[in-house]
């Protein structure tokens, strides 16, 4: 087999492949043998029918088509391996020669990872927001803690903001009751905004057993998106009594003896939460600083796949109803055109980020260890509320483990650069990034980038070379090894 590669653009190539007919003859023999087992021809035992009779019965062209369809994917994969191309997405394949007894020829156009000239990281510096825990934030945490230890007491007065009420609900569209839209004994905190839009305004001022009708859009069912007349009836009213914020409360609600000690602990909790946000800001600022220093060509099909993933996520919550999605955008003061423009811009930036970090990980010789993958599995499984083993099985069955590997590898690349960067906050304070990302390696990142050693491949946990071209979403743009 012969193959050659033509560079069409920084992000796309055309691979030309020629397969000698002699290489396909064994495929023909196997195909005829299998076909002979499946058909019965008069005068011949199963599996004994001559090739010429099979060709006369089924046609040589049909057999040739089948052989070519089976041969192209494997030969395409072989051409990729020989040329060391890292494809992004599925190829566009065209068979240019297909005749019995002649060489098979086809071309495959596919997007590829572009060559990226990495920026000079010497003196890289980023700035992030300063953080502090304000008294208001500490008080809010204290109020939340007091609410957890509060008691509900029934009151004989109209509903007010902050009350806890029990209500009955029913809905009608065009005067007809809506099935499955009625509920009794629902608990609701007034002004929490957790149920139907307009409900809080409707119940304020009502007494027990009083009702009010208001208009709201139904979110689900056959009448989803339509205006309905909703009737709410108040069945009970309770108010929450909070414990006094004193030393006694501190001893009840925590391991501390005094309210001052409890406040100090809450202040540290607020700061810790903000440090998590600051770490994320450092990551993003580091990536943005890198992107400002380098030009990253973007494969259009890769950007399109990323955009389609964003759109799919947005539509999945409303049963893929694009008309309703467009209505919701208008209700929010936006439009479909604005959404598409923002989503495409974000998708293009995300693709640039992925490609840059893949190239950076190559040059830094990033190694993804078992602990790194396990940590990501645990964190992701917590987000979905499932066991890590369940998530692992799902990713394995859906061929998404390579995608997770690539994401972890990119994260380690960002971490390495952030460790070496100078990070300050808006107040001029230098931030010790080791608190977020650990200590930098003995070899400086900038030294590693100057290393002349080959850095075209990452290393996986077993020490094998690993192609890192997989996108963040394996379903949206997977690395193709077939003619698909």
Swiss-Prot record:
InterPro entries documented for this protein: PPIase_dom_sf, Trig_fac, Trigger_fac_C, Trigger_fac_C_sf, Trigger_fac_ribosome-bd_bac, Trigger_fac_ribosome-bd_sf, Trigger_fact/SurA_dom_sf
Residue numbers spanned by region Disordered: 427-484
Keyword Lipoprotein attributed: no
UniProt cross-references to Gene3D superfamilies, sorted A to Z: 3.10.50.40, Trigger factor ribosome-binding domain, Trigger factor, C-terminal domain
SUPFAM superfamilies: FKBP-like, Triger factor/SurA peptide-binding domain-like, Trigger factor ribosome-binding domain
UniProt keyword annotation of Cell cycle present: yes
Main location: cytoplasm
Keywords: Cell cycle, Cell division, Chaperone, Cytoplasm, Isomerase, Rotamase
Entry GO CC: cytoplasm
GO MF annotation list: peptidyl-prolyl cis-trans isomerase activity; protein folding chaperone; ribosome binding
BP GO terms, sorted: 'de novo' cotranslational protein folding; cell division; chaperone-mediated protein folding; protein transport; protein unfolding
Subcellular location: Cytoplasm
EC annotation from Swiss-Prot or TrEMBL: 5.2.1.8
Comp. bias (Acidic residues): 444-476
EC class name: isomerase
Annotated domain remarks: Consists of 3 domains; the N-terminus binds the ribosome, the middle domain has PPIase activity, while the C-terminus has intrinsic chaperone activity on its own.
Name the UniProt record assigns to this protein: Trigger factor
């Amino acid at each position: 087999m012969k193959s050659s590669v033509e560079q069409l653009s920084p992000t796309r190539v055309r691979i030309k492949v020629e397969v000698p007919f002699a290489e396909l003859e064994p495929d023909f023999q196997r195909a005829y043998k299998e076909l002979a087992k499946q058909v019965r021809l008069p005068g011949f035992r199963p599996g004994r029918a001559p090739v010429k009779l099979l060709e006369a019965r089924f046609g040589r062209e049909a057999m040739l088509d089948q052989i070519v369809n089976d041969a192209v994917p494997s030969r395409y994969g072989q051409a990729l391996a020989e040329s060391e191309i890292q494809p992004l997405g599925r190829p566009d394949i065209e068979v240019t020669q297909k005749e019995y007894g002649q060489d098979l020829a086809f071309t495959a156009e596919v997007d590829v990872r572009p060559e990226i000239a990495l920026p000079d990281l010497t003196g890289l510096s980023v700035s992030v927001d300063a953080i502090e825990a304000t008294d208001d934030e500490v008080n809010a945490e204290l109020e939340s803690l007091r609410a957890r230890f509060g008691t509900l007491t029934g009151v004989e007065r109209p509903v007010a903001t902050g009350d806890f009420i029990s209500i009955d609900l029913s809905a009608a569209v065009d005067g007809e009751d809506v099935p499955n839209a009625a509920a009794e004994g629902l608990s609701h905190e007034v002004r929490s905004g957790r149920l139907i839009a307009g409900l809080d305004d409707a119940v304020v001022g009502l007494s027990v057993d009083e009702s009010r009708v208001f208009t709201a859009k139904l979110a689900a069912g056959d009448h989803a998106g339509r205006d309905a007349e909703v009737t709410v009836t108040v069945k009970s009213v309770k108010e929450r009594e909070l414990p006094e914020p004193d030393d006694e409360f501190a001893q009840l609600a925590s391991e501390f003896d005094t309210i001052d000690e409890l406040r100090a602990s809450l202040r540290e909790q607020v700061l810790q939460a903000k440090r998590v946000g600051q770490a994320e800001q450092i990551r993003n600022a580091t990536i943005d600083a890198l992107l400002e220093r380098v030009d990253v060509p973007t494969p259009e099909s890769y950007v399109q796949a990323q955009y389609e993933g964003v759109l799919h996520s947005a539509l999945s919550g409303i049963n893929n109803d694009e008309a309703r999605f467009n209505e919701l955008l208008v209700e929010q003061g936006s439009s479909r055109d604005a959404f598409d423009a923002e989503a495409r811009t974000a998708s293009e930036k995300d693709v640039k980020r992925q490609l840059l970090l893949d190239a950076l990980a190559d040059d830094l010789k990033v190694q993804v260890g078992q602990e790194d993958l396990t940590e990501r599995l645990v964190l992701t499984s917590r987000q979905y509320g499932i066991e890590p083993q369940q998530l692992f099985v799902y990713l394995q069955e859906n061929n998404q483990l390579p995608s997770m590997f690539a994401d972890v590898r990119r994260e380690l690349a960002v971490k390495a650069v952030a460790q070496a960067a100078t990070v300050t906050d808006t107040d001029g304070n230098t931030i010790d990034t080791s608190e977020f990302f650990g200590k930098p390696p003995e070899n400086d990142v900038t030294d590693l980038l100057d290393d002349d050693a080959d850095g075209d491949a990452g290393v996986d946990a077993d020490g094998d070379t690993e192609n890192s071209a997989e996108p963040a979403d394996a379903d949206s743009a997977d690395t193709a090894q077939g003619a698909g």
